[in-house]
Amino acid sequence: GRARGKNPNMGSNDERENTLNQLLTEMDGFETNSGVIILAATNRADILDSALLRAGRFDRQIYVDLPELKDREDIFKVHVKPLKLAEDVDISFLAKQTPGFSGADIANVANEAALIAARKDKNAVEKQDFLDAIDRIVGGLENRNKVIKVNEKKTIAYHEAGHATVSWLLQHAHPLLKVTIVPRGKALGAAWYLPQERQITTKEQLLDQMCSVLGGRAAEELTFGQISTGAQNDLEKATKQAYAMVTIFGMSEKIGNLSYYDSSGQSDFSFTKPYSEKTAELIDSEVKELVENAYTQAKALLKQHQEQHKQVAELLLEREV
């Protein structure tokens, strides 16, 4: 049901288009009194062909969003019913720890917590088992046996402490949940946040989030006078967010209130940008300025609170958590 392209070079009689045309024909061919109701589901409604959504076809749409706090509580109650829970398990607390989780994710948390408790020969599933299960699903399997050199471990500790310190000091950054230097999956360390479930996000909130993301690299440069490849994922996040701010949300003074986001799904068939080369250069310049400003702010905050940053890093190294 993907939207048909307007590019003449794509060919108008490919199999996908034939299938779509046949589907449209079949939907138009039912008798009005036949009592046939057609249901369909997709997670990419934005790229469906407009002919599918016209009156008499898929003309009623129900948007099913990810569960919110109360919904997650109810889903948790369903999935923990078969489990024997310890007294310290608080369902509302678990719901608060899992923003952005789908129903399947929550079922996975309950199953994983039960497995963790069983491995430790416990009589009941405890609160810590659920927290360990959430960590495993979010960050991957813990790998304490991974060989990491002393100087590398120190770099990781100061990097993660940088994220923690900067996000703690920023008004609009997501609240810090946990920071670790224990390798999980491909990550050598991680700082996890508890995103607030907002319906809209302001420019100040986005800038603070970007500053928090760059706190790790800023900490490396300030502490050791050099930078490493450990910030690759952070840089990717910051760059994507900056491009979104400039090209989608119209948050750049020089570009103005323009959005180059194509919600029709037609852009996949087009090889041209909807703006000139001069504008492309201006976008790149604005993105670079946003990222550099956030990085400068992160360094300034860490320089100002150097002692606290050091305390967090040394605590991570000491306890190896």
Predicted regions and their residues:
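Conserved catalytic/switch belt of AAA+ P-loop NTPases
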Residues: 1-60
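Residue-level signature of catalytic and energy-coupling elements of molecular machines
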Residues: 23, 42, 58, 72, ...
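Soluble catalytic regions of large protease machineries
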Residues: 151, 155-158, 164-321
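Flexible beta-alpha connector loops of hexameric P-loop NTPases
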Residues: 1-18, 61-69, 83, 100, ...
